[in-house]
Amino acid sequence: MQREATLGRSVSVRGPGMHTGRVARVTIAPAPAGHGIRFAVPGAGPAVPATTVPWIASRMCTALALADGRKLRTIEHLMAALSASVIDNAAITVEGTEIPILDGSASRWCGLIDSAGRVVQERPREVLRIRAPFQVDGMHGFLRAEPAEAFAVDVSTDRLPGFGVLRWAGPIDPASFRTEIARSRSFGNASLIWRTLLKTRLARTLLPAGTRDRLWARSFDAQTVRGDGPEPTLAQPEHSRPIGPDTDARMHPRDREPLLRGARPGRVAILLGGRVLGGARFPDEPVRHKILDLVGDLALAGRPILGRIVANCPTHALTFAFLTELMRHPECWEVVTLAEAGPGNAATT
């Protein structure tokens, strides 16, 4: 029987947030079996679970509503690293209101988790097994869950100017996540990021004379290194279930909040047409980062998902809607515990 796991010791990291630009310190500590992943902000009330219940709409990130009315923003990269590392229980303390962006990827989070070690606990590990296809669409994309013997994804996007269709498919496990997904970085449009830097009066400090020209000279053309194989095609939607009006109402931010104040080279992959300024880590880095975000957002199901996720142009809000509506259709899923030998032997709980 597979069992839950937590960290072997506490680990901490400090850094600025992508959107607020403010420095926060995050400590990830071991937690008892059955605890789940919970976030606490000193002075903001009780810790909140990393589930769809406290999820609150926030532009360009995933956020949780704190008891004092504030938001804890940009949890998705840390959640992806915990999920892909098979960590079920952790007590996370955040001295601030946004998780540090670090280098824009989940690589450093994975390194911290690996350095802490993984401790198996006594409680059987439950997973949410997909029994029947389930799909929602909206916001120019769709998400679909299909029955499968392991967690896998098939994600495509065609909404990045100059990149054409980008698509990546494969299983997600601790090894594949680290080698194929974790290093992919958050990305943003060059003009939007330059404008933000200018507005915050940081451009002269961060981008001294000649820097922009050097970045252009080192630009990486994703189209030219994709290879001579066939051009990828978009994943295709099937029968979709409607998003309920109450779910739809929660998908849209209702307040103004800081955006991209901490974005700069070294923390984000800056896109210009079909190029990644300064070089890309993968030819299809943007869609791989879409998968990173998707893995983190799907972790808000509260249990690991056993199934294949097919998505086109997924967003944080659409993934929230997908999980919320999926929970309303229990005929499409079941909660099971899995034998150590693999997913083929399961018991319904």
Task: Provide a role label for each language-model segment.
Residues 1-349:
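Short acidic-hydrophobic catalytic motif
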